[in-house]
């Protein structure tokens, strides 16, 4: 509920973060809807204390799918960016699970037209084709298309530090002005008795 969100905002602000995700790729304020709240009002109230503290807010965007798990018409996605900007969202973090730049390109345009910062993601995985050169070239292509920031999106938490370091170094060598963020979804589980015993 929005009253709960507003209560935890000061604690998040006190952490000293510079940005906070306010709309994830799977929810779109579904919890607010379940409680009978207007999600547009909820997002505005949720982002207000962060903006007052100088903290930017993010939204997650699945490229051609928007916030859904299936494609969204272009005119709807274009309007969506304008609505999110009006709600107080500063940055859009766009990703395509296929790492297809063609799917991300329209989001860059829509974000910039709406006055938002376009942050584009490299979805990290391991295969013979997903090399340091592959990700470097993808980042450079996204920047050429107008991306303001690059996100190293390590959703499975499998990124190898040496490889990630090389990717970042390559991007910075070509574009030192481009901010690069690392985003990981790490799930920790308690060790099993077998792990503890070492057997």
Identify the role of each PLM range.
Residues 7-24:
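Catalytic domains of carbohydrate-active enzymes, especially glycoside hydrolases
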Residues 13-14, 85, 143:
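Non-catalytic positions within long, well-ordered alpha-helices that form the structural scaffold/packing
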Residues 17-19, 51-57, 89-90, 114-116, ...:
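Short, well-ordered coil/turn segments that N-cap beta-strands
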Residues 25-106, 117, 122-136:
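Active-site beta->alpha loop and helix N-cap motifs at the rims of alpha/beta catalytic domains
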Residues 137-175, 179, 187-190:
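Catalytic core of soluble alpha/beta enzymes
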Residues 188-199:
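Single conserved hydrophobic/aromatic residue that forms the stacking wall/gate
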């Amino acid at each position: 509920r929005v009253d709960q969100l507003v209560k935890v905002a000061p604690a998040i602000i006190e952490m000293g973060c510079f940005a906070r995700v306010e709309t994830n790729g799977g929810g779109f304020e579904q919890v607010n809807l379940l409680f009978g709240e207007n999600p547009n009002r909820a997002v505005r109230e949720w982002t207000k204390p962060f903006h007052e503290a100088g903290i930017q807010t993010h939204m997650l965007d699945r490229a051609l799918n928007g916030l859904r798990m299936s494609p969204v018409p272009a005119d709807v996605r274009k309007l969506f960016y304008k609505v999110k900007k009006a709600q107080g969202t500063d940055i859009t973090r766009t990703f395509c699970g296929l790492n297809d730049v063609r799917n991300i390109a329209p989001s860059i345009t829509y974000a910039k037209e709406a006055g938002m910062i376009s942050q584009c993601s490299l979805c990290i995985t391991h295969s013979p084709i997903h090399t340091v050169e592959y990700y470097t070239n993808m980042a450079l292509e996204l920047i050429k298309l107008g991306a303001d920031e690059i996100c190293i999106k390590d959703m499975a938490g499998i990124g190898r530090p040496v490889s990630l370091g090389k990717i970042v170094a390559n991007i910075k060598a070509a574009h030192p002005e481009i901010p690069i963020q690392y985003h990981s979804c790490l799930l920790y589980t308690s060790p099993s008795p077998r792990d503890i015993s070492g057997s």
